């Protein structure tokens, strides 16, 4: 299967890529050109396309022809500094670009869009008694990464 992973150099993206490469799939990563981890990913046996999530043409070219898209790419705390507008353009408009490009891709079978734990409180005042389920905690972002 042809798989595209945005955010391939991130903690989760790297592990998703390794998993599908080990299963013999054709994995391509879409990454920001300034990402210093690109070369590391090439060593795992995947192709890397550089571009910007907020640029629809870049996103459309990356999505085209893939059967599966995992969208995990985002401007994040340690990648910046980013302004509030940059967080919005990259994270929100970038996600819309992924959705729009996916609609234009007749080969696409699956689109997986992820979020972040930056939208929930990481250290509640009271200890957690049970594992966290999807709708257990209110959204409680504390920075522009979480907001976007």
Protein language model features and the residues they cover:
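Residues at the starts of beta-strands that form the adenosine-phosphate
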Residues: 2, 26-27, 109-110
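Conserved catalytic-core motifs of eukaryotic protein kinase domains, centered on the activation segment
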Residues: 40, 79-86, 122-127
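SDR active-site strand-loop-helix element
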Residues: 6, 30, 69-75, 111-117
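N-terminal Rossmann NAD(P)H-binding glycine-rich loop of SDR-like oxidoreductase domains
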Residues: 3-25
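Conserved Rossmann-fold NAD(P)-dependent oxidoreductase catalytic core, especially the SDR/UDP-sugar
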Residues: 96-142
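Conserved glycine-rich Rossmann-like NAD(P)H-binding loop of the short-chain dehydrogenase/reductase
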Residues: 25-34
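NAD(P)H-binding glycine-rich loop region in Rossmannoid oxidoreductase-like domains
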Residues: 36, 46-90
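Active-site helix of classical SDR
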Residues: 144-148
